[in-house]
Amino acid sequence: TGTMFMEKYPVQTTLTLRHLREFWTPQVRAGLRNSVLLGLGTAAVGTALTAAAALVTARYANRAARWVHTLSVLLMAVPGLVLGLSFVLAFKGTALYGTVWILILAGVLHFFTTPYNLLYQSLQKLSSELESVGCTLGIPPLRLIFDVLLPQCAGTLADMAAYFFVSSTVTISAAAFLSTASTRPLALLVVQYSDQLNLSGAAYLSFLILAVNLLARAAAALVRRLVRR
């Protein structure tokens, strides 16, 4: 990261702030906006879907739940490159192709397993009698989920959202096949600058990604701290 403060690394290592102004171009601003939108969308959609899957598999013992659990774990075995190429073949020519939504969908599937396992383990630690008590008291299942189960795992949900956000903003495997000029995230611009031997520019973009991800992690830590009070 220090190379962005050097005149021309590694030829001229004089310290300068010139690059900070030069690299703040419309292309970089668009890439930053795309990365934030991608991160927020993946965090929202991914957290919702993984929460639904974990609730089904951790709290209900039936054949459908076992299938959902198996598929959720198997998603980890799919490489990002394979996922990206599969999406190109499946969605090319559709309205979804070339939009940020296809990047969000790919990101959710790519990073699904780890957040799923986090919430799955948290839900299994809760008493297995909660559903029986709720049924006895006449509490609707959805109310039990939103008023009891999910609030008990609020810190885990925040960590899941942060994981989706951070992972989606730094990945390049699936995004390399699915992004267009208007949806290209900063991570791909880092690769482009690096290939052009523009190391200062690549370092600057990497620093921007790091700063955004630190904010996401700080927000998750704040939520977890508030939950513990």
Q: What spans do the regions from the language model cover?
A:
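Faces of alpha-helical transmembrane segments in polytopic inner-membrane proteins
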Residues: 46-49, 72-83, 96-120, 140-143, ...
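Membrane-interfacial helix termini and adjacent extracytoplasmic/periplasmic loops
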Residues: 6-10, 14-17, 22-26, 60, ...
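Interhelical loop and adjacent transmembrane-helix boundary motif
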Residues: 4-8, 12-27, 169-221
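Hydrophobic alpha-helical elements at and bordering transmembrane segments
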Residues: 1, 28, 32, 36, ...
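C-terminal transmembrane helix and the adjacent membrane-cytosol boundary/short C-terminal tail
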Residues: 55-63, 120-130, 135, 139-148, ...
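Transmembrane alpha-helix signature in integral membrane proteins
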Residues: 26-59, 64-67
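Loop-to-transmembrane-helix entry motif
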Residues: 27, 35-39, 43, 71, ...
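A structural signal for multi-pass alpha-helical bundles of membrane permease subunits
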Residues: 1-8, 34, 84-95, 106, ...
